[in-house]
Amino acid sequence: MKKYILVLLFSVSVTHSQTFQVEKLNGNVKMLSSNSNTWQQVKSKMILNENDVVSTDKNSSVLIKGNDLSFTLKESSAITVANIKNMTLDELILALAMENVMNTPRKKGNEKSDNTGVYGDKISKETLSTLNSNDFGMKRLNGAKQLAENGMKESAIVASKEVYRKYPDTKKDAESRIYFADLLFGSGLYEESYDEYTEIKLLELKSEQKSHVNEKLEQINKKLINK
């Protein structure tokens, strides 16, 4: 993948940000913006910006529409609005390279939460505690899966990588890890998916999960040998 990065930095077109609007909602739906330090109730016709995080409770959902996209966030899920977009394979490769850079160990003394970096130091302790919890990380993984279900597979992969970086404990969930590794495999990114399956193999897996992971690793080995 590395040999493509320098080329992509110059060749990938800049994606123009969209403004999204809440079209329909059901139940308890909240949002957190960079201009607020607490969660706010989402209302119909509310305008959402790309840094906003939207979260649904159980038995709740929200329909979000942009210029050329619509997305329904189902119950017990969360998503950053910026992730609601279509991406090309080249854009995905570049985003994965950037995620690798973000995963580089930080220097001592630079231990600020990623969420504090986005929402500022004025964010309330209660809100920050919710944002940084493993449960909220799982809600964001649910949202990432729904991106894939709506045809935005590349964005789903990027969203999952961000979640795994910010919420390391969510990487222990084998079912979700396999789901997103399969998306990488389906995108033809065999080296990247191989790395994922190799990590997943170290988790506590059910027998069918072990078989699936081993089968994928064998398939990738054959593809890379014949490359």
Regions picked out by a protein language model, each given a short descriptive name:
Residues 4-13:
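Sec-dependent N-terminal signal peptides
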